[in-house]
UniProtKB/Swiss-Prot annotation:
Chain residues that bind ATP: G116, T117, K118, G119, K120, T121, T122
GO biological process, one term: regulation of cell shape
SUPFAM superfamilies cross-referenced by the UniProt entry: MurD-like peptide ligases, catalytic domain, MurD-like peptide ligases, peptide-binding domain, MurE/MurF N-terminal domain
Binding-site residues for UDP-N-acetyl-alpha-D-muramoyl-L-alanyl-D-glutamate, renumbered to this chain: S38, N160, T162, T163, S189, R197
Protein's UniProt name: UDP-N-acetylmuramyl-tripeptide synthetase
Modified residues (N6-carboxylysine): K231
């Protein structure tokens, strides 16, 4: 891979990003490397000065390591002797130049992208499974949990971000193409658009699953309007669009889709009993829940319109991943696979046995009922989870272990208090990625909004201890829910990813201790 200095200048001019260029000589320069981390510079490299934590010394280090050209929003004396491309927006520039450096790998992939407040990961895993049933060893996945760039075990690794930085995104795409991948299923976060990680990227199919207030705070989206706006950008940049017609703010969502996509390329889905508030749209697919219990979920997918029927994906489906709320995610995945040319003959078996790390994982503890570990980390996902369990287990006592991250998602905290008041019998408030905040203060913030006449609250900073106390306090007919972290193998504490054995590993340790003691 390489990119010439001349090509960089032309691309930046084309996108109206170039403010000025300081070129050291008239000869064109080929950059054979690209980086925003000075430690990853080796040889003639295009280096980006980006991020709130960028320091000029990083540019000096990049220069010492062989960088030839730097891109920044202002000149740096540390860059004297290097070609300097001064741009209006560094994150947009990095996205545009990274795509070019890796030779536009998205053009060699069928890209299916999901956005939504909840369900992105589940829908993505369902889609990957269906596509793998039809085209084994050819499906890439970029999710909150895993990144898959090839068919071999060492080509599957843990993700750092839901949607990676643009340079990493296009590098991973190129690696996937080189490894023979033909399709990519990816999650796209609102932060990805806010920070221009997917700037210039067009998807073959874009999904809008739902929207509720989340990720609103000083370090994220300033307002809900900004959060929604960034979510909608996925639809504006998709060739075909699929929308959950039951989403809040549907009119705005549908309007965004129609700005760049013809109605015949927009597909709507909803549950069997849903009736839209407007009569100028048609629901293309309906899913009818047959049974959702603690063993499996079964539903029927019914194509309603002619264009829906043409995909040949209607039929009866079962899910090993329990929870009636997952039927909506499964419907989205089946439609996505259908738009990629995969019909029900692969979708039915492909989706049936899917299990997702940290999603509805459960185990029985002798004498203490069932324990569920789930990534549910906002009001909407917690409500869906607790409502399902309350119904499936015939109104059990619910003991919930939960915390809220520091430095972000401040709007989640009153949501946790609300959902605990609505559903929990006992709440064990604990630590969950506190970052630079004091976890005790976060716990107090949640606790202050809980109705203590309805919920018994325990404040336990040590997450292991909180899980142990919740399980120990539970009876044989009770349900313990450990929410928020799912399969995360670390706690984010003061800028450090501190190893964490995962919630389920802790649950199993506690269960073993109880059985032995």
């Amino acid at each position: 891979m390489a990119l010439s200095l001349r090509a960089c200048i032309l691309l930046l001019k084309e996108h109206h990003l170039l403010k000025s260029a300081a070129i050291q000589n008239t000869e064109d320069v080929d950059m054979t490397g690209i980086a925003y981390d000075s430690r990853k510079v080796s040889g003639p490299t295009l280096f980006f000065c980006k991020g709130d934590k960028f320091r000029p010394i990083y540019l000096s280090m990049a220069k010492d390591n062989g960088a030839r050209t730097y891109v920044a929003e202002k000149p740096y004396v540390e860059g004297n002797g290097l070609n300097a491309l001064i741009v209006r927006n560094i994150t947009k520039a990095m996205a545009i130049l990274s795509a070019a450096f890796f030779d536009y790998p998205q053009d060699d992939l069928f890209v299916i992208a999901y956005t939504g407040t909840k369900g992105k990961t589940t829908a993505s895993y369902f889609t990957e499974a269906i596509l793998n049933e039809a085209r084994p060893r050819h499906i890439a996945l970029f999710s909150t949990i895993d990144t898959v760039v090839g068919p071999e075990p060492d080509q599957r690794f843990k993700s750092n971000l839901t949607t990676p930085e643009s340079l990493d995104l296009f590098r991973d795409m190129r690696e996937a193409v080189e490894n023979g991948m033909t399709h990519l299923v990816m999650e796209v976060s609102s932060q990805a658009y806010l920070r221009n990680r997917v700037f210039g990227l067009t998807y073959d199919v874009g999904f809008f699953l739902n929207i509720t207030p989340d990720h609103i705070g000083p370090n994220e989206h300033p307002t809900f309007a900004n959060y929604l706006h960034n979510k909608l950008q996925l639809l504006v940049n998709a060739r075909k669009v699929v929308i959950n017609a039951e989403t809040e703010h549907f009119d705005q969502v549908y309007a965004a889709a129609t700005t760049t996509t013809y109605p015949e390329s927009i597909y709507l889905f909803a549950s069997a009993g849903f009736r839209p508030k407007r009569d100028d749209i048609d629901i293309d697919f309906r899913f009818d829940s047959q049974e959702a219990d603690v063993a499996e979920s079964r539903f029927t997918l019914v194509p309603v319109t002619e264009k829906a029927a043409a995909l040949n994906i209607g039929g009866h489906y079962s899910l090993a991943l329990i929870g009636d709320f997952n039927e909506s995610n499964a419907t989205a995945a089946i439609i996505g696979a259908g738009l990629a040319g995969v019909d029900a003959s692969a979708a039915v078996p492909g989706i049936a046995k899917v299990k997702i790390p940290g999603r509805m994982e459960h185990t029985k503890v002798a004498g203490h009922g069932a324990v569920y570990v789930d990534y549910a980390h906002n009001y909407a996902s917690m409500k869906a989870l607790l409502s399902f369990l309350k119904h499936a287990y015939k109104d059990p006592r619910l003991l919930v272990v939960v915390g809220s991250p520091g430095d972000k998602g401040v709007s989640r905290r009153p949501g946790f208090a609300k959902v605990l008041t609505e559903f929990a019998t006992e709440a064990f408030l604990t630590t969950d990625d506190p970052g630079y905040e004091d976890p005790a203060n976060i716990i107090e913030e949640i606790d202050s909004k809980i109705d203590h006449s309805k919920v018994k609250v325990h404040k336990v900073l040590d997450r292991k201890k909180a899980i142990a106390e919740a399980i120990s306090d539970s009876g044989p007919n009770d349900i313990v829910v450990v929410a928020g972290k799912g399969a995360d193998p670390y706690q984010k504490v003061r800028g450090v990813n501190t190893p964490w054995p995962t919630d389920m590993a802790v649950v199993k340790q506690v269960a073993k201790s109880l059985q032995e003691g």
